[in-house]
Structures are given as structure tokens and as C-alpha cells.
């Protein structure tokens, strides 16, 4: 049709069409209804409109929308370079090596950049810890940089409430705090050696300063278990590619573990097909209270309560000839032994594969179970073959809950003048230590929060400082096996934020 006409107009040949009886009758009530629904365009519904006029209006609106969207393209502030590098073609994606850190473990990644803007995060195929594997969390990490809910500027408390501030004023406040002393830092745990060096400098140069760490999800029981056995915390590094028999006591190494990517790759390499010339049929035993990924692929899965795992571990230790530590012996003395025949079969399987077996305990188990599991690994000859140990960062650090208690005691005794919180939200996810963390932070004369979001903790601090995303900053970290990985920025900070290194540097300068 070249024209859209009212059904009452008969100036053209053809059958008149209508959508309802009211439209066909063209009553005053129908016209009033249309006027109410389309007040500015009601006359157009009853008069002919040419296709040319319709396309003209639509073309103008499309051009206007395209013009408005194109207004931002020439802005170059967020590009990491002022001029295009030689040999770089616009529109061709480029990948850069960097690292992404989660739960105090850095993973090597390849970040794809499109015309100076990072758009994708994948595993680095040249990194030895996971050989290019990736997780959903790793790939989704790029979305945090473009999150419109990110904090975009510093703010501080005034007589009228929270007001925006600039970084010059914030840096001045940080330097004043460093000169005054009595600075306490509560930070998220990190494997960064650069941040560790800055931490040591803060403790050395700022009078009466202290450093504390907190994370709601941690592996403190594993650290304490190795400390009980070896005298200092160690990090167990498993090699599932050499484990003919794997026993998981409430552990999920294929999913719920910082090194799950490497574990999955190693385990899959050992489970070769029976059609191969020399098939390898490794065996997995899983004792757990909740179905996990590892339990789902296990050859034998034994359901058990989490509270029963120490008793089962003690039975395995007795069957393999390992002496129980006094703490574990006291914990399981009153518990009756399991009557499940598969526990004895598991112990026999371990003894028949000495040097090619491995036991792992989950992070929900107490430190005594971890110590017992490592003692069994040593007795069964796993160390040096299916298991090794690496040094951990800040081995002298106490457990997270004990560190919170130490900080709360310092605040209560008036030993903290400035509290700097970096990448943590204790008001939301930390347990109360006598008082809520909202009240504890309120007792400190000066409180400053550095984070990606203006969250619950930022709301009770006197200062909130917007933090850079990991794609906007320099840094470093260590993978689970101790491999050092460097971080490089893919883009200039979108909101002129600062990293933890820059903020601590301002305090000690």
C-alpha cells in the first residue's frame, strides 16, 4: 500500500479494512479513546499518510539516534595510547597476557582488546598452571570493568552528609594519616609480591601501624593443618596426572578448589580410553556430604556427614599404619568406627598403590583432619610423586578470624587513629567481634575505604575511594603452584581510580 487511509474514506478502490467494530463505527467515544492513548498523534490515525512522509520521519529519527551514539566515538581519554601503534589495524582484536586473582591465587589470562577496549578474558595457553583452561568467573570478570554500578569518584563525609571529592584531597588525607601514625589496614588477602613489599614498608616506616587480612571464603584450616605437621604453613600442590588412586575426604578438587583447572586437566589426562593400547584406569574415591563435581565422576562415592569425616580419616590412618595426632585421637575417641566395608576397601586400595596414590581433604574440615591427611600422604610415599609443597605468602599471618579479633582489640584499646580498608566489606560479610563492624569502624577517628563499589562498609566510613579494576592496573601475583605472573593494564582507568599499591604508597610517602 502506498497510503494508509481511514476506513471511512472511499477515495480509493478496494475493500475497507478495520480492526474493531468501534473503529468501523468511528464513534466519538472511539476518537476520545485514541486521543487519550496517543494525544499528539491522534489526527494522523484518521488522515492519509504517504509512505514517503513516513520514511522521511523514520529516517530522521534513525539519523538522530546514530548521530547521538556517534558523539562519543571521537573521545579518546580511555584509550591506553595517544596514537595508534605502528602496524596496528583498526577493528582487529589484539590479545595481551595478564593475570586475574581470586582467593589469593593468580591465574594467567589472555585479554582480548578491540580498538583499545578489553572485551574478553580467557586462560593463557602458555601458563603452566592451567594451560589455557578457563572458568565462568574468569570470563565474566571483564563485565566488572564496565559495570555502571561501579564507584566513579571519591567521596567523604561533610556536615551535609556524603559529598564528592577529588583525588588530590584524598591523597592529602592519606599522607596526613601516614605522618600521624597508628594506621591499621584491613585488606583482602593477595599473592602479590609488590603489595607484600609495600606492606612491609608500611609496617617499618609508619609508627604503630598494623596489617590485617580478611576474606569470607578462605582455606585457613588447610594452612593450620600443614603448620601443625611441618611447623609452618605450606601449600599442597597435587599432581592428579600421577595419581592412580585418589581419595577425597569432603573435597572437590575438580571444581571447588583454587587449582581446579589444573586438577581437571591432569585428571582427564589419566583417564584414558579402554580402547587405547595401554589403557589407564585411575580410581577415584569420594567421601562427602553433598554431591559435588568430583563425587559425580567418582568410581566409588560414599555419602557421609561432614562431622563423620574425621572419624573416617582416623580409620584410614589406622589401617595404613599412621599414628593419630593427639588432637585427632581425642576428637574421634568416643565415636564408633564406620561399619561401611568400603572404608576398608579404600584403605586396601591406598596400601596397594603406595607412591601412586593421593589423599585430599576439603576446606570445611578442621585443621586436625588436614594434618592427618598429609601424614598419610607422607606414609604412603605420595610426597615427591603425586604431591609437593610450596611456600605460602605471609606464612606468619594468623587465621582470618583471629586477625579480625586482633584488629578489634586494637580499636577497642584506642590504638588505631586511621583505619584503611582495601577491597573488603566487613560490615556485610565479617562476623561481629563483640560489636558489629559498623560500630567498630565508627569508633575510629579516621576511616577510609578503597573499593570498586560504594558498598555497606563505604557507607559507614568517612572516606570512600574508587578502586581500579584489575584490567586497569599494574600488578603481579602467584599461582597455586607458586608460578609468578605479571599483570598489565589493558586500558587507562575509566573513572580515574587508584590501585591498592598506589594508595599504600601515598600513606608511606
Could you describe each region identified by the protein language model?
Residues 1-337, 344:
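N-terminal export/assembly segments and adjacent metallocofactor-ligating motifs
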